[in-house]
Amino acid sequence: MGDPAGIKQRYRQFAENECKDYSDLYYRLALSVSEDDEVADFIADMPENQPNLFLASIQLLTGAPDMPATGSALRAFVSRRGGEVRAVMRARRTQTNEVGRCAVLLPALPPGPLALVEVGASAGLGLLFERYHYEFGSTCLGAVDSPVRLQCAATGPVPLPPAVPRIVWRRGLDVRPIDVHDDDAVRWLLACVWPEHRERRRRLEGAIDAARADPPVVDAGDLVDDLPAVLAKAPDDVQLVVFHSAVLS
């Protein structure tokens, strides 16, 4: 549970520090929460009340084009469908699986063959390096026919590999893994993408399609308690790489 005054302050900081220049809609809505007693009281009543969770829950229920666009519309929506918002917020946690990070991680991978372990893997899309197409200026790597096209500007002496390393084994670990064949889970993952970030959404949709033919295994578990058991499953005769995509990106 939260304090309504603290909720207002938190949402104002979220608007100014995270949404400004990145999402006009979330900027407006977060600012409106910071000035609205009724909505702040509603959010404060939730065990998990972070802004991304609240806004993604609304996007899940409405779809991005139909989200409330003003403070008064948000208040009316919460008044009308607050029970549904509450149910989503209690059942879900925010998830991201930004495959664009693979373009930044790729130059850091050692030559193959590799065994990859990603912690905080979500749906495991960040494990599928060889299924995406990469463009580092005039240098192209990866699957030429991939629906996922990743462009990355390389400045300075970036050691680009001659090809995507061969990956012979991969495994993810996440507290709440996403199954790419679970339509409800996929809809939630897409709802966590901010509404204006259409290119990111297209990348995510393409990566989900690429994963469905042969999805990576993502074990349910905690980094501290369960990582050793995952590492023990990796083959001994290849280079083991353990990563979390936000660390290097």
What is the predicted role of each segment?
Residues 227-231:
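Distinct, well-ordered alpha-helical segments
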